[in-house]
């Protein structure tokens, strides 16, 4: 009996390690090649297909140099002001988010860095479970070990959700403002950054008071952050 238990545990461990190697292999490949899709994109494609089998995501990759510096600053100011300083985890930000959530009695702040958000988007589902958070941490370590900050940020800007079926800076710029990502103004960039936490809602509530208030805050902060 004990022998079978040991074999079962060994088999599970082997599968776990193989899965991590599969993820690591993709990260190494994406260091030089652009992702065609992500786990989160696939999840949203399936959701849209439930009501419209012909639905397609709006996703267009653009190189880092073709994305407005205004948007880069706005995203860092909004999502991860210490992006260039940490190695994947902002422990002070995590503690602050934890305290806010305890105070409110519900999840109102995440504390996830740009690297953590990218890890989740590339490989994981949107379900919140302890396993997913642990796997997200492992993937974040891999991303930071393999890629430099510029590449992490380039992929992030191209794959995050910015509306219902809208992914990446280029598609978002054209969807909301009918301009390429390279031509976004400071105000437009700040508003796009403010939408990131809840993009599908803000896609249909573009004059929401909370969104407009956060946009102004980001505009005040964005010129004081460093970007890759």
From Swiss-Prot:
NCBIfam families: mono_pep_trsgly
GO biological process, one term: cell wall organization
Transmembrane region(s): 8-28
Catalytic activity, EC: 2.4.99.28
Primary localisation category: membrane
Alphabetized Pfam families for the sequence: Transgly (PF00912)
Name of this protein: Biosynthetic peptidoglycan transglycosylase
Keyword Transmembrane helix belongs to the record: yes
Pathway stated in the Swiss-Prot or TrEMBL entry: Cell wall biogenesis; peptidoglycan biosynthesis
Compartment(s): Cell inner membrane
Family: Belongs to the glycosyltransferase 51 family.
Keyword rRNA-binding tagged: no
Signal peptide interval: none
GO cellular component term, pick one: plasma membrane
Encoding gene per record: mtgA
Catalytic activity: [GlcNAc-(1->4)-Mur2Ac(oyl-L-Ala-gamma-D-Glu-L-Lys-D-Ala-D-Ala)](n)-di-trans,octa-cis-undecaprenyl diphosphate + beta-D-GlcNAc-(1->4)-Mur2Ac(oyl-L-Ala-gamma-D-Glu-L-Lys-D-Ala-D-Ala)-di-trans,octa-cis-undecaprenyl diphosphate = [GlcNAc-(1->4)-Mur2Ac(oyl-L-Ala-gamma-D-Glu-L-Lys-D-Ala-D-Ala)](n+1)-di-trans,octa-cis-undecaprenyl diphosphate + di-trans,octa-cis-undecaprenyl diphosphate + H(+)
Species per Swiss-Prot/TrEMBL record: Laribacter hongkongensis (strain HLHK9)
């Amino acid at each position: 009996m004990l022998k079978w238990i040991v074999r079962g545990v060994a088999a599970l461990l082997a599968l776990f390690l193989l899965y991590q190697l599969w993820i690591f292999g993709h990260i190494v490949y994406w260091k030089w090649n652009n992702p065609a899709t992500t786990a989160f994109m696939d999840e949203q494609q399936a959701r849209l297909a439930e009501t419209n089998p012909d639905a397609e995501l709006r996703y267009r990759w653009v190189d880092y140099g073709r994305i407005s510096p205004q948007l880069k600053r706005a995203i860092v100011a909004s999502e991860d002001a210490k992006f260039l300083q940490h190695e994947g985890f902002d422990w002070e930000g995590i503690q602050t988010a934890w305290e806010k959530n305890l105070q409110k009695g519900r999840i109102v702040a995440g504390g996830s860095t740009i690297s953590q958000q990218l890890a989740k988007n590339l490989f994981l589902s949107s379900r919140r479970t302890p396993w997913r958070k642990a796997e997200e941490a492992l993937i974040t370590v891999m991303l930071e070990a393999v890629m430099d900050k510029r590449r992490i940020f380039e992929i992030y800007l191209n794959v995050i959700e910015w509306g219902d079926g809208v992914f990446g800076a280029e598609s978002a710029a054209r969807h909301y403002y009918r301009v390429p990502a390279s031509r976004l103004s400071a105000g437009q960039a700040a508003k796009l950054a403010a939408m990131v936490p809840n993009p599908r809602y803000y896609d249909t509530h573009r004059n929401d008071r909370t969104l407009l208030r956060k946009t102004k805050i980001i505009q005040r902060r964005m010129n004081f952050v460093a970007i890759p």
